[in-house]
Amino acid sequence: EMQRSLVGSEMCIRDRFKYVERFSHVMHIITDVEGKLRSDKTCFDALGSTLPAGTLSGAPKIRAMEIIDELEKTKRSTYGGAIGYISFNGNFDSCITIRTGVFKDGKAYIQAGGGIVYDSIPENEYQESINKASAVLRAIEEAGDIV
């Protein structure tokens, strides 16, 4: 997806192999990808070409998004979007908003999910979703103790 904004096929995986990064409630496979933008593209084009992230939408992306729209009762809102920064020297970095609470009218709204693939075990995927949501819930509880 990002390749559409890059010069030729100048996209490379910085670390030849993916690595696992451990967080408080879950683990993620991380891969750092770099590329050189075409002269007619900006970092916004590169970011836009990757959203929503395939890891959250599934593949093929357009059909997967149609199915999500048909089946999910609640819109994803900021979930699955991106938060990031652009520095004055042109550096750009972003992350997917997958563990984020949205506060509205005195309530916190939290969305979490897991990836379902051919050999998924439903109970494990459900527990993964609970683990992901619990990290945000715990942060809200701890913030409430401070405020």
Show where each model-derived region lies.
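Conserved hydrophobic core element of enzyme catalytic domains
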Residues: 25-147
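Compositionally biased, low-complexity linear motifs
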Residues: 10-18, 92-99
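Gly/Ser/Thr-rich active-site loops/lids in small-molecule metabolic enzymes
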Residues: 14-29
